[in-house]
Amino acid sequence: MVRDGLVLLARRSGHRRRYPGVWDVIGGHLEAGESIEETLVREVEEEVGVTPNRFSALGEIDEPNPEINDPHVYHLFTVHDWSGGEPRLASDEHTEIGWFSLAEAVALDLALPEYRDYFRRVLAAG
C-alpha cells in the first residue's frame, strides 16, 4: 500500500514461525479456489481493515521452501486506493503498522531483502 510517497508495512508478531519480529508487506496465503486478486483483497481487509479499490501487479519473488521442497511464490501488488478509512492493525499476525519513506523502508529489518527493490520501483514512480 502506498500513499504520498510512503509505503505501509507491518511488523510480524514474535510468535510467527517464519520471520518473527521483522517488517513485512501486507499479505497472506491463497485459499482454495481463490484468485490472486481475491487473496489480495481478503488479506488487506483482514490485516489492516480496509478494502483495496485500485491496485496493480508488481511482480513475483520465488523463495526456496525446504519444508515442501518447492519454492514459495510471493505475488507483489501495489495498492493505490482503498476504502474503509485509515489502515489500522486488525490482526494478531502483526504488532504494529507504519508508513515509511523509501530511505526508512530500505533500512528496516525486512522479511525478504528483495522487497527493497520493489520499494525503490514503487516509490520512485510516485
Tell me what each language-model feature is:
Residues Y19-V22, E67-V73, S91-H94:
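A generic structural micro-feature
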Residues I61-E86, G98, A103-E104, R121:
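Active-site-adjacent beta-strand/loop module that shapes the phosphate/pyrophosphate-binding cleft
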Residues M1-D24:
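N-terminal strand-loop-strand
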Residues G84, S91-G126:
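Nudix hydrolase/Nudix homology domain
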Residues V7, P20, F55, P71-L76:
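Structural motif
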